[in-house]
Amino acid sequence: MQHFVGRNNELNDLNAKYQSPNFEMIVIYGRRRVGKTALISEFIQNKPAIYYQGIESTGDMNLKNLSEKINDLKNDDFNTASYADFEKAFTEVQNIANHLEQKLVFVIDEYPFLARSEHSVSSILQYVIDHVYKKY
C-alpha cells in the first residue's frame, strides 16, 4: 500500500476545517501537475464526498455529469435525469448533507473548465453558498 507523501501540513489543515462545526469553503489552487488532485483524493478518503471534475465541454454536459455524481452518492441508480439547472444541483448537495451523520465534502475539480462552459455558474454557486449552505 502506497502512503501519501508530502502535503501533510495541507492535509492536516483540510482535516481541521472538516472537523469545524461550521460550513467551510476551501479553494485549492496552484500550477498544474503539483499534486492538488492527489491531495484532494487523499483528503476525501473515508468521508462522504461528491467529487466532480469539470470538463471542457458545454454547460449542459457538465450539468449532466455533475447530476450523475450527485445521484451516485444518493445510490439512486434509477434516477438518471439531470437536474434542471446548476442551482438545483448545488442545492441538492445540501439536501443530501442534511441527511448524513458526517459532513459532506463537495469537490469541484478543474473549476475553470466548468466556469467557461457555463458563464453564470460562479454567481449561482456564490448565491447557493450564501443562501443555502451557510444556513447549516
Each language-model region and where it sits:
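Phosphate-binding site recognition
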Residues: M1-Y136
